[in-house]
Curated annotation (Swiss-Prot):
It catalyses: Ca(2+)(in) = Ca(2+)(out); K(+)(in) = K(+)(out); Na(+)(in) = Na(+)(out). The lineage of its organism: Eukaryota, Metazoa, Chordata, Craniata, Vertebrata. Component of neuronal acetylcholine receptors (nAChRs) that function as pentameric, ligand-gated cation channels with high calcium permeability among other activities. nAChRs are excitatory neurotrasnmitter receptors formed by a collection of nAChR subunits known to mediate synaptic transmission in the nervous system and the neuromuscular junction. Each nAchR subunit confers differential attributes to channel properties, including activation, deactivation and desensitization kinetics, pH sensitivity, cation permeability, and binding to allosteric modulators. This is Neuronal acetylcholine receptor subunit alpha-6. Residues 1-25 form the signal peptide. The gene is CHRNA6. Keywords: Cell membrane, Disulfide bond, Glycoprotein, Ion channel, Ion transport, Ligand-gated ion channel, Membrane, Phosphoprotein, Receptor, Signal, Synapse, Transmembrane, Transmembrane helix, Transport. GO terms for molecular function: acetylcholine receptor activity; acetylcholine-gated monoatomic cation-selective channel activity. One of its GO terms (biological process) is synaptic transmission involved in micturition.
Length: 494
């Protein structure tokens, strides 16, 4: 006989033993029930037979695509790489059970290779397997509904138009359908009208504007049957910030540096140097960004057109600069200025361009600067032969000192012509007068030459100013015209 103390100890130990091991037994019972259910479902199951009670009935498959990542868009090879989840839902009448008979089990996770699956493939796959691998498990409910959502990475073919690169939009499609079953055997139904993007990771280069799905029934030339497919169209837009900062803005700066060439004075001697420096910088820049631009010969990208436009722009600036410098350094001994050049470039265009001479020039100042008496002075040896008064000779020997004083006063109060005509004509004076006349004639010739050279320089300045405005207009409107094309093109498509 056990004492009351011993009975209490035995009762407590039994309760503890039951509390510890009862969940284990329940788990074992549950595992046994699930194993019994699995054996019951798949003991006579054939995974190669369509799950229909009547052979003429189609299997209705509900299909949906969920995108998690837009991995890459290869413009050169025209491939779009995406990470997708493909949701398949269909009913298999051979996989039904009563939950009451199996301890309330309502769902099973079963390997996908144990059940019949629709052979849904990506029609426009470019690289890799066309069909999804069945390594994931499917969710089976007691009423026979199967939900299978395998992940897949697809590299699909996508015809791309990079005309407006880097402001381009692309329309890439994913076409899913059964490869062997026609519409009479598998009827595909789309879940929703758009791609599920709840778990989508944003891409740093592309933005998905729209991703709509459509169902198509197509009859191919190879077969008489009608095949059903579901096509998802991804309308994507390139994010142009990277290319704008690293490609377009530097080109804009180079273009406007080219415009400054025409504002640089020709006398500084650095116009051609600046043009060549800009051209070299553009060439080096093109070599650096060659790998960034899609290499294709089908179309010329917008940024390629702009780079070509900038290259032509800089080259023309060099040609025009050489032409302007040629005009700037012309002289009367090498070129004669035509009358139409004087009319157009010295009168008309300066008024149109709001240009004027820095100082008002009086034409003919060079000739007026030469004393008329010296210009009409007789040749040496003939100064006293005609028209010289006789009493002047006699008075010259008698009153030499008085005449010198009088000559000084006359030099200060009378024109030079009067002084020459009424002064002494000794050989020394004649030499001085001839030297002054030679200097005056040289000054006149120099002034006339300087005046013509100034006219040529002013013509070069006018030509520079004309091309300054022409290049500014071409640069602004050319740049705006190129980069407004994507906006106008997208507006026209919409």
């Amino acid at each position: 006989m056990l004492t009351s103390k011993g009975q209490g100890f035995l009762h407590g130990g039994l309760c503890l033993w039951l509390c510890v091991f009862t969940p284990f037994f329940k788990g074992c019972v549950g595992c046994a029930t699930e194993e019994r259910l699995f054996h019951k479902l798949f003991s006579h199951y054939n995974q190669f037979i369509r799950p229909v009670e009547n052979v003429s009935d189609p299997v209705t498959v509900h299909f949906e695509v969920a995108i998690t990542q837009l991995a890459n868009v290869d413009e050169v090879n025209q491939i779009m790489e995406t990470n997708l989840w493909l949701r398949h839902i269909w009913n298999d009448y051979k996989l039904r059970w009563d939950p009451m008979e199996y301890d309330g089990i309502e769902t099973l996770r079963i390997p996908a290779d144990k059940i019949w699956k629709p052979d849904i493939v990506l029609y426009n796959n470019a690289v890799g397997d066309f069909q999804v691998e069945g390594k994931t498990k499917a969710l089976l409910k007691y009423n026979g509904m199967i939900t299978w959502t395998p992940p897949a990475i697809f590299k699909s073919s996508c015809p791309m138009d990079i005309t407006f690169f880097p402001f381009d939009h692309q329309n890439c499609s994913l076409k899913f359908g059964s490869w062997t079953y026609d519409k009479a055997e598998i009827d595909l139904l789309i879940i929703g009208s758009k791609v599920d993007m709840n778990d989508f990771w944003e891409n740093s280069e592309w933005e998905i504007i729209d991703a709509s799905g459509y169902k198509h029934d197509i009859k191919y030339n190879c077969c008489e049957e009608i095949y059903t497919d579901i096509t998802y169209s991804f309308y994507i837009r390139r994010l142009p910030m990277f290319y704008t900062i690293n490609l377009i803005i530097p080109c804009l700066f180079i273009s406007f540096l080219t415009v400054l060439v025409f504002y640089l004075p020709s006398d500084c001697g650095e116009k051609v140097t600046l043009c060549i420096s800009v051209l070299l910088s553009l060439t080096v820049f093109l070599l650096v960004i060659t790998e960034t631009i899609p290499s294709t010969s089908l179309v010329v990208p917008l940024v390629g057109e702009y780079l070509l436009f900038t290259m032509i722009f800089v080259t023309l600036s060099i040609v025009v600069t050489v032409f302007v410098l040629n005009i700037h350094y012309r002289t009367p001994t090498t070129h004669t200025m035509p009358r139409w050049v004087k009319t157009v470039f010295l009168k008309l265009l300066p008024q149109v361009l709001l240009m004027r001479w820095p100082l008002d020039k009086t034409r003919g100042t060079g000739s007026d600067a030469v004393p008329r008496g010296l210009a009409r002075r007789p040749a040496k040896g003939k100064l006293a032969s005609h028209g010289e008064p006789r009493h002047l000779k006699e008075c010259f020997h008698c009153h030499k000192s008085n005449e010198l004083a009088t000559s000084k006063r006359r030099l200060s109060h009378h024109p030079l012509q009067w002084v020459v005509e009424n002064s002494e004509h000794s050989p020394e004076v004649e030499d001085v007068i001839n030297s002054v006349q030679f200097i005056a004639e040289n000054m006149k010739s120099h002034n006339e030459t300087k005046e013509v050279e100034d006219d040529w320089k002013y013509v070069a300045m006018v030509v520079d100013r004309v091309f300054l405005w022409v290049f500014i207009i071409v640069c602004v409107f050319g740049t705006a015209g190129l980069f407004l094309q994507p906006l106008l093109g997208n507006t026209g498509k919409s």
